[in-house]
Amino acid sequence: MSRLLLIVLLACSIASAIGVVYMRHMHRKLFVQLSKLEHSRDELNIEFGRLQLEQATWAESNRVDQVSRERIGMKFPETSDIVVIRP
C-alpha cells in the first residue's frame, strides 16, 4: 500500500514538474510575442505621429490657398463680384 502511494506521489510530482516546465516555456514564448507586439506598437505610434504632422502641413490654410491659386487658378472675388443674399 505504501509502495503504491509512493509511486502515485512520485507520478504526481513528475507531472507537476512537467506542468511547471511547460508553463514557464509558454510564459517565455508569450513574453517574446508581447515584446514584439510592443515594438510594433511603438513603430506604429511613431509613424502615426509623422502622418499627423504631414496631414497638418498639407491642411494649412496658406498651403491650400497656394495650391488652389497655382493648380486651379482660383482667386478671391472682387468686392463688386460679391453678392449678399439675405433670407
Swiss-Prot record:
| Keywords carried by this UniProt record | Cell cycle, Cell division, Cell inner membrane, Cell membrane, Membrane, Transmembrane, Transmembrane helix
Q: Where does it reside? A: Cell inner membrane
Q: Which GO terms describe its biological process?
A: FtsZ-dependent cytokinesis
Q: Which Pfam families match?
A: FtsL
Q: Does the keyword Transmembrane helix apply?
A: yes
| Membrane-topology annotation of the record | Single-pass type II membrane protein
User: Which family would the database say this protein is a member of?
Assistant: Belongs to the FtsL family.
PANTHER family the record matches: CELL DIVISION PROTEIN FTSL
User: What is the protein name stated in its UniProt record?
Assistant: Cell division protein FtsL
